[in-house]
Amino acid sequence: MENIVLIGMPLSGKSTLGRELSKILKYDLIDTDTLIEEMEDKSIKEIFKIYGEDYFREKELEIINKLKKESNKVISTGGGLPIYNKNIYELKNIGFTVYLKVPLEELIKRMVKKEYDTRPLLKNNDTKFLEEMYKNRIEIYEKAHTIICNTNYEESLIKIVRAYKKWKGI
């Protein structure tokens, strides 16, 4: 499959870089959280509140199965999608996985800078929770095909495109 799959922590820039990559490569952008919101006709926050996290993770698995048929897409995943049900391996079969690595200190700055009411796992700007999440997820994220330190927007885009072309053998 010739897709680019962006993974990483919440606030790592997956949606922002995904939008720009889709323009550069002339690929459609798929945001897994947006797809789930459209399927359920509810926000992620509402889904978590009404049905719980397990239900949400089941919906992510449904999305992964749909994505197996896609090609020439930039896929921006929710931060937890690669973590559950060994989804990282499914994502690697869907396309070229890119872990957008952002230092924890930078993630905390980004979280504190804004109120993230739409992100149920980041409610109350709980830096300790973010730190725990980071520690628990990093090992799985690092199984991606490539790791891009996303502290500079333009540099990250260039590195992702180069790594993707190399992976494709171009």
UniProtKB/Swiss-Prot annotation:
Q: Where does it reside? A: Cytoplasm
Keyword flag Metal-binding: yes
Gene name linked to the record: aroK
Any idea which positions bind Mg(2+)? 15
Q: What InterPro entries does this protein's entry cite?
A: P-loop_NTPase, Shikimate/glucono_kinase, Shikimate_kinase/TSH1
Q: Which domain of life, per UniProt?
A: Bacteria
Listed under subunit, the entry gives:
Monomer.
One Gene Ontology term of the molecular function aspect: shikimate kinase activity
Detail which positions bind substrate. Answer: 33, 57, 79, 137
According to UniProt, the reaction catalysed is: shikimate + ATP = 3-phosphoshikimate + ADP + H(+)
Residues bound to ATP are 11-16, 119
Q: How is the cofactor bound?
A: Binds 1 Mg(2+) ion per subunit.
> What CDD domains does UniProt report for this protein, alphabetically?
SK
Listed EC numbers: 2.7.1.71
Pathway field: Metabolic intermediate biosynthesis; chorismate biosynthesis; chorismate from D-erythrose 4-phosphate and phosphoenolpyruvate: step 5/7
Entry protein name: Shikimate kinase
Q: Which cofactors, if any, are listed as required?
A: Mg(2+)
Q: Does the keyword Ribosomal protein apply?
A: no
Its cellular-component GO annotations read: cytosol
Q: Which SUPFAM superfamilies match?
A: P-loop containing nucleoside triphosphate hydrolases (SSF52540)
Q: Which family does it belong to?
A: Belongs to the shikimate kinase family.
Keywords, alphabetical: Amino-acid biosynthesis, Aromatic amino acid biosynthesis, ATP-binding, Cytoplasm, Kinase, Magnesium, Metal-binding, Nucleotide-binding, Transferase
Biological process annotations from GO: amino acid biosynthetic process; aromatic amino acid family biosynthetic process; chorismate biosynthetic process
Protein purpose: Catalyzes the specific phosphorylation of the 3-hydroxyl group of shikimic acid using ATP as a cosubstrate.
Main location, first listed in the record:
cytoplasm
Q: Which organism is it from?
A: Clostridium botulinum (strain Okra / Type B1)
